[in-house]
Amino acid sequence: MMSVNDVVLPSYSEDIVLDSIRRAQKGLEEKENAERATALDFYYHKNVDTHIEQWFSTSTLQQVPVFPQKIVPRFARARNMIYKNSPKRMINGEQADDYKDMTHHLDTRAREFNETSWLTGQMGFRSRWGKERVEYDLIPFFKKYYVQGESEPFGVSYEVGRDHKNNRIYVFWSRARDGAPGIHMKFDQAGRTIQVNDDNVNPYGIIPVTFVDYTTSASDVIRAAIQIGIANTEIALAERFSFGQPVATGIEEATKMKLGIDRVLLLPEGATFSFVGNPGSLKDMMEVVKGFANQAAVNNHLRIRWDESGNPPSGTALRLLEIENLESRISDIPKWKDWEHERYEVDREIIRVHTNKDMGENYAVDFAEV
């Protein structure tokens, strides 16, 4: 399925490719990428305050801090069980111990990749040679390049950082094609090429990035997390002002009044002072929070079990004890088996180039948890 970050070229030639990748990066600031960035903020629970603060005035936020909850990673882990336990990897019918020794934290990174791919709808997984073994990076923002009429990308580009002048730096990889070697190069946001090796040749001949695509993202989970953060902040405000809003009548507008338990309030004749209560109840507000979470869970074949031990108006009533997966994840297995095979072939070639050792054919994987 094509996305806004897929580039289709009418034909393949080095000049067309180089011109396209320089122009393509200018379109990366798309709505799809903004939503993906928000999803990852909530998954890693970083910068989440900014996504809640925009819904409140500055004066309101001087009363209480925003109150986001760390529910997105729990949803992602409950919904994606394939890598809960390490899968069994085999080469030529035997345990792939040599391959395991040549990879660094593969199971950990694979589980993170599994969860973030489901959450965002699409992620890239880069294999790279590190300290005498293959190491891995997750790539959330990238461009894939296709020749018109072909379903497999011939290249990929993604940002890798900034230079000392704060220019964005990108990397481009392409596979060997029609007898020509693949390309590996860097370039900046102005399109200037930065050489990485002699002739900018891809030493592997393949793209060292593999991908998983879902038909949709879990955007409803992210929106539920935002709604819950807003609602919890509203609850904190309601608790802060549980005595009600102070209201005075019969007092000149310029009169300054200071409230406090250690202060005596002197009112002029005919003036009144009172607190007007909040018409809402904390219990009702907490049920709304639960409703947001429960609906997102149902949409994703999950069920939430809440702590019912405390009194309903207490914070204990909002403690999420467990998220149960109500549906077997067997349907996800073919997708992830395909990815395991694609990634293994990439790892195999990287290991062969750097060590002259072939890990072997007939790779197989068995997922212990579905």
Describe each model-derived feature in a short phrase:
Residues 1-133:
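Extended, helix-rich architectural segments
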Residues 98-110, 284-288, 292, 332-339, ...:
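Short amphipathic alpha-helical segments
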Residues 115-120, 124-211:
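Extended, regular secondary-structure scaffolds
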Residues 270, 342-349, 360-364:
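Active-site lining segments that contact anionic ligands and/or coordinate catalytic metals
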Residues 323-335:
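Glycine-rich and small/hydrophobic secondary-structure elements
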Residues 338, 353-370:
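Extended amphipathic alpha-helical segments with heptad-repeat/coiled-coil character used for oligomerization
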